[in-house]
From Swiss-Prot:
Subunit structure: Heterooligomer composed of large and small subunits.
CDD domains, per the entry: ExoVII_LU_OBF
Catalytic activity: Exonucleolytic cleavage in either 5'- to 3'- or 3'- to 5'-direction to yield nucleoside 5'-phosphates
Keywords, alphabetical: Cytoplasm, Exonuclease, Hydrolase, Nuclease
Protein name: Exodeoxyribonuclease 7 large subunit
Organism: Escherichia coli O7:K1 (strain IAI39 / ExPEC)
Amino acid sequence: MLPSQSPAIFTVSRLNQTVRLLLEHEMGQVWISGEISNFTQPASGHWYFTLKDDTAQVRCAMFRNSNRRVTFRPQHGQQVLVRANITLYEPRGDYQIIVESMQPAGEGLLQQKYEQLKAKLQAEGLFDQQYKKPLPSPAHCVGVITSKTGAALHDILHVLKRRDPSLPVIIYPTAVQGDDAPGQIVRAIELANQRNECDVLIVGRGGGSLEDLWSFNDERVARAIFASRIPVVSAVGHETDVTIADFVADLRAPTPSAAAEVVSRNQQELLRQVQSARQRLEMAMDYYLANRTRRFTQIHHRLQQQHPQLRLARQQTMLERLQKRMSFALENQLKRAGQQQQRLTQRLNQQNPQPKIHRAQTRIQQLEYRLAETLRAQLSATRERFGNAVTHLEAVSPLSTLARGYSVTSAADGAVLKQVKQVKVGETLTTRLGDGVVISEVSAVTKSRKPRKKA
């Protein structure tokens, strides 16, 4: 007997093409770790090698436009991590992988974890600009979360002392490297938020390798920075070092020193501006006095030539009035300058964002309370409806009817018996009781007489 449909018949070319498409579409891009062997580089510049482990191996190719981005020369026996696409070389039917990138195994695994966590947090929206909190301007107190013995703390304190010696600084010491470092950094951020002593935080450390900076690529640290109510400035390593903490922080500074520059006022610059204004005022005063002195000299010379005592007295009186006016004008000018400085200081204080932040925090707390109350009310109503439904279901359940002494009898075909004409002698019946099932065989069928109607 022939099957209803004949099996598909492939040519070798079509088979290889189908397998290649399946590999490329189903597997996609994968990460593979293994040991390099049989490494060759022909004149074309492409790399051909075998990637193997203890029990298996696979042929690999890395084309010139991809391998020129590799920062090291692969060696026989070297453990590497590669990102590759799986494919099939159709002419020979050889299964192979096309390598897109290559890294030494240790650093490569860390880089892979870094990329995976970065993609995860980015998908959750932790890097979105809408969640970035503005930095206070000016800051009234700065919190520093770093190692108390590291160079980063020294650099931060040095810059703050140089730029704004009067700015209070609170240090939350923590480890920045090692297995315990992420947990300590998280606790330091939470402690700073609990105490609420400062209005901006610097979280960071000095430079180092990817392994040295790995504490700032920890998911716990990233979520703690995101959850911080106090604005956070990240300052990890050098300008070329970019960590997950940099993406989550409200502002990323390339170095710890740069972070200190960002959060502090340059009092030396303010002092230079005041000194410059003072110098300009002194120059104006000198110029004014020089002109008046020159005028006085000219008048005095003319009086000496004329020798009239009365005119000399009048000129002296006029000179005194002019000197008083000059002094009064200088005092008024200095007074106006002082008043303008006070107005500028008052406007600067009015721009303090702390009240707005407090109102926003209060609004968030109110919304959280309303959300919790709404959820509790909905949960209570749902539980009540569920209990009523269970009670109703138990009331109409046929099992309850059976438990009161009734039974249900069905024929061999499963039909429920309602009349004796449905049954024949010799048939097997199934009777369902409240606590089980009875199987019986019909030996006789008797139809009951209908009761007589009353006259």
